[in-house]
């Protein structure tokens, strides 16, 4: 796995955020905003891991975000982050039925996020896009791109915005998405792969938390 300088800086930043959130959790386990930051950092860090570790880290992120929801059930940013985690996880899976289970969960959480914040255009577009995800996953796997990634081991986080051109992105082995969201006081790039980039490239950050 090769990292650019920007990748390495992001890795350090989010690892620092993860450690800070872990320490803060010991002081105040009922801080839902801290749990949101923790889950967001794990979501970002999963991009830099080999596939098996990335899946575990995504599950850990979901766990932290679900815990935030037990404290604040209406926290729509957490719902949206969980949906992105399930989407990323689905693209790490070759079996279409197993992937569909993750996509279905992603759709459920995108819908819940939109229900909590119905004026959020990003949530609405995310929900619309998620309905097309299983078909894109199948195309991705049929074209052999999925086997390249699933058999390749490492994550492919790239610095800055990932290219919207799928073939160019795959050659560079980038799996960033252009989902961007400002939920933790910084911009997080939701992890994913080039197929999801093509679907999500027009999305911008949601409004600040209410």
Curated annotation (Swiss-Prot):
Residues 151-161 have a biased composition (Gly residues). The chain crosses the membrane at residues 179-199. One of its GO terms (biological process) is protein insertion into mitochondrial outer membrane. GO terms for molecular function: metal ion binding; protein-transporting ATPase activity. Pfam families: TOM20_plant (PF06552). This is Mitochondrial import receptor subunit TOM20-2. Residues 151-172 are annotated as: Disordered. It is a single-pass membrane protein. There are four genes (TOM20-1, TOM20-2, TOM20-3 and TOM20-4) which encode mitochondrial import receptor subunits TOM20. In mammals and fungi, the transmembrane domain is located at the N-terminus while it is located at the C-terminus in plants. The overall orientation of the protein in the membrane is therefore inverted. GO terms for cellular component: cytosolic ribosome; mitochondrial inner membrane; mitochondrial outer membrane; mitochondrial outer membrane translocase complex; mitochondrion; nucleus; TIM23 mitochondrial import inner membrane translocase complex. Gene3D superfamilies: Tetratricopeptide repeat domain. InterPro entries: TOM20_imprt_rcpt, TPR-like_helical_dom_sf. Keywords: Acetylation, Membrane, Mitochondrion, Mitochondrion outer membrane, Protein transport, Repeat, TPR repeat, Transmembrane, Transmembrane helix, Transport. The N-terminus is blocked. Residues 200-210 are mitochondrial intermembrane. TPR repeats lie at residues 42-75, 83-120. Disruption phenotype: Slightly delayed flowering time. Triple mutants tom20-2-tom20-3-tom20-4 are viable. Forms part of the preprotein translocase complex of the outer mitochondrial membrane (TOM complex) which consists of at least 6 different proteins (TOM5, TOM6, TOM7, TOM20, TOM22/TOM9 and TOM40). Component of a mitochondrial large protein complex that contains, at least, MIC60, DGS1, TOM40, TOM20 proteins, and petC/RISP. Expressed in roots, flowers, young cotyledons and leaves. Residues 1-178 are cytoplasmic. Central component of the receptor complex responsible for the recognition and translocation of cytosolically synthesized mitochondrial preproteins. Together with TOM22 functions as the transit peptide receptor at the surface of the mitochondrion outer membrane and facilitates the movement of preproteins into the translocation pore.
């Amino acid at each position: 796995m090769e990292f650019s300088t920007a990748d390495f800086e992001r890795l350090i930043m989010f690892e620092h955020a993860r450690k800070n959130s872990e320490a803060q959790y010991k002081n105040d386990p009922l801080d839902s905003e801290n749990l949101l930051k923790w889950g967001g950092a794990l979501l970002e860090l999963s991009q830099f891991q080999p596939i098996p570790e990335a899946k575990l880290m995504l599950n850990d992120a979901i766990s932290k975000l679900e815990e935030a929801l037990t404290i604040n059930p209406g926290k729509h940013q957490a719902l949206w982050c969980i949906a992105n985690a399930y989407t990323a996880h689905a693209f790490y899976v070759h079996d279409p039925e197993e992937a569909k289970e993750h996509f279905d969960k992603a759709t459920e959480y995108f819908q819940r996020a939109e229900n909590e914040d119905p004026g959020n255009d990003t949530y609405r577009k995310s929900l619309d896009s998620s309905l097309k995800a299983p078909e894109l996953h199948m195309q991705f796997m049929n074209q052999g791109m999925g086997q390249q990634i699933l058999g390749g081991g490492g994550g492919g986080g790239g610095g800055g915005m990932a290219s919207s051109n799928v073939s160019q992105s795959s050659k560079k082995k980038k799996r960033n998405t252009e989902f961007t969201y400002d939920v933790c006081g910084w911009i997080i790039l939701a992890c994913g792969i080039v197929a999801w980039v093509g679907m999500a490239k027009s999305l911008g950050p949601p409004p600040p938390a209410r």
